[in-house]
């Protein structure tokens, strides 16, 4: 198991792909710090880990608040002394809304969580990885296939995910001098509470509604383990993992 003795942090670890990634990293031997708003949801994730639960720490964290992120990393520093892997996963969305009907409050909410929160956590991880001995680590940002091709009515979400792509490239570039690698996983239709609506049908670019296939979220966990376990001389800069038959290529 490549993760033995290594410390990983997963944000948004209480459900969905964050939960899948947490459990996969634990199975690989990592010690995992879970961060999220809901302590009860994170404890539920830990309850699924069996004997691996002994290698977990759950920290209630609002990633949009700088003080909360600082407190999270101080706790990691105090308890473990270092951080080897970050899965920067926390995110959210608003209901599908035509761009002309979107309010600034909706826009700001998505930007605060998906972009500002991602920055705050990645920035704190970068600083910790730069200062620790041995130096370095790996940051994995959760992008989306919306970082490539938008859905109808998803301007805020799509804009933030395109921005994450730019931030991933910048972190990867700036991190070279400190042995900090940064990659991005772009996920399409993992079966989670966030994608439950796919079974009821979602708007398509041609104006129709279509039921879309999903994939087991465990596929995301396996991909995170692969990305996290690469040698320091390699980086999976961008990885797309999606339901095989979902509309994506041309959104058709």
Task: Please report, for each region that a protein language model flagged, where it lies by residue.
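Conserved glycine-rich cofactor-binding loop
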Residues: 14-16
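C-terminal helical subdomain
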Residues: 184-185, 204-249
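The beta1-alpha1 cofactor-binding region of Rossmann-like NAD(H)/NADP(H)-dependent oxidoreductases
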Residues: 60-71, 104
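Residue(s) in the substrate-gating loop at a strand-loop-helix junction
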Residues: 144
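Substrate-binding pocket helix/loop in short-chain dehydrogenase/reductase
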Residues: 97-99, 106-111
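Active-site helix of classical SDR
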Residues: 122, 160
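Conserved glycine-rich Rossmann-like NAD(P)H-binding loop of the short-chain dehydrogenase/reductase
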Residues: 28-44
